[in-house]
Amino acid sequence: MDLYISNYTSDDDMAILRRRWIELLPLVVGDIVHVENPEGYSYLLDPIIPGPGYVVTWYHQLHCLFFLMSEYDRLLRHGPNGKERSIPAGSSSIHTRHCFEILRHSILCHLDMTLEGGSAPFFNGTTGFGHAHVCQNRQEAIDWMEKNRANDNRMIIRA
């Protein structure tokens, strides 16, 4: 877990985490993939970019989770000493609110029915760790995204 979670100590730590999170992503421009004949899919809205390019939801969710962790890290490290008014480029409450909503939708859409029990002695409730979950085949999803990528960039948050 510590490989992907901030220890709230420095910008250098967050830069290392950003690189690790980027390695979780397929080789695509963030979340954009090319869809042939989108008019053949009645549920698709207009593409986000011409080509036509569409956003893949699981990437968007991972992006939002990283963004929220980054904002929380910034708040913990800079908030108490008055630097909370000094917001770095890329930070925004609108983006943060959007990411909370994306993750809410994800939770309600996937409705993971894993039964969690057995909490850690220091935790009042369940930690959620150590339980068997049924997941999608990650490699199949990555292969499809890389095959249909718009270009060869990788990013977790646009810098």
Swiss-Prot record:
Its EC number is 1.-.-.-. InterPro entries: UstYa-like (IPR021765). It holds the Pfam family UstYa. Keywords: Oxidoreductase, Virulence. It is an enzyme of class 1 (oxidoreductase). One of its GO terms (biological process) is mycotoxin biosynthetic process. A motif (HXXHC 1) lies at residues 60-64. A motif (HXXHC 2) lies at residues 95-99. One of its GO terms (molecular function) is oxidoreductase activity. Pathway: Mycotoxin biosynthesis. Belongs to the ustYa family. PANTHER family: TAT PATHWAY SIGNAL SEQUENCE, YALI0B05434P. The 2 HXXHC motifs are conserved in ustYa family proteins and might form active sites. UstYa family oxidase, part of the gene cluster that mediates the biosynthesis of the secondary metabolite victorin, the molecular basis for Victoria blight of oats. The role of vicYa within the pathway has still to be determined. The pathway starts with the processing of the precursor vicA1 by several endopeptidases including kexin proteases as well as the cluster-specific S28 family peptidases vicPa and vicPb to produce 7 identical copies of the hexapeptide Gly-Leu-Lys-Leu-Ala-Phe. This is UstYa family oxidase VicYa. The gene is VicYa.
